[in-house]
Amino acid sequence: VVFPMVLDDATQEEGWQEAKRIILSYLDEGKSVVFLTLGDPMFYSTYMYVYRLIENTGHEIETIPGVTAFCAIGSHLGYPIVEKEEVLAIVPATAPKEKIDAVLAVADDAVIMKVYKNFDEVQETLIKHNMADDAVMISRVGLPDEQVFVGLDNMPKDTKLNYLSTILAKRKDR
């Protein structure tokens, strides 16, 4: 099953419905189906949309947890994500700028996912909240073409970010 990487709701829904049709055709034949996903299937994953379409069809579904990108990054770099009483915010960079700003205003630590399109805005907001200096940005963690940037100012301006790009950041003044 191939899903379109678009923001158009109607196109996404068509893709989910097509996946449902294909998956149910195999399940109705008595076959087992595996739906592999990057990260955790219940965390910013296409899986959960297809799951909702299939969950009440009478077929048994077993969802096996995966490792989220930010946990993989923390372990991969030896970068503690959150400690003691710190408050962690997990934010998609695709959210409205005002929401991101409001969340980062109260968070001690942040995970910002899907930064590939809005990096400049995210960087500006992290700087505003004193979270940019020691932030790490990784694109395609654990893959052969992985890119790691420590301190967001160290990224070359012509860096092409991938959809699988995530920032981990900590507030310096707390």
Q: What do these predicted ranges mean?
A:
Residues 1-60, 148-149, 164-166, 170-173:
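Class I S-adenosyl-L-methionine
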Residues 1-4, 63, 89-92, 112, ...:
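Structural signal for conserved beta-strand scaffold positions within catalytic alpha/beta enzyme cores
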Residues 12-21, 77-79, 103-106, 148-155:
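Short, surface-exposed amphipathic charged segments that create phosphate/polyanion-binding patches used
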Residues 13-20, 44, 67, 94-97, ...:
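Electropositive phosphate-/nucleotide-binding environments in soluble metabolic enzymes
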Residues 19-26, 80-92, 154-166:
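A polyampholytic, Gly/Pro-enriched intrinsically disordered region
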Residues 33, 104-174:
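A contiguous loop/helix-start segment that scaffolds small-molecule binding in enzyme catalytic cores
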Residues 35-37, 63-66, 83, 112, ...:
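General beta-strand structural signal in soluble alpha/beta enzymes
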Residues 42-106, 172:
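Class I SAM-dependent methyltransferase SAM-binding "motif I" and its flanking Rossmann-like core
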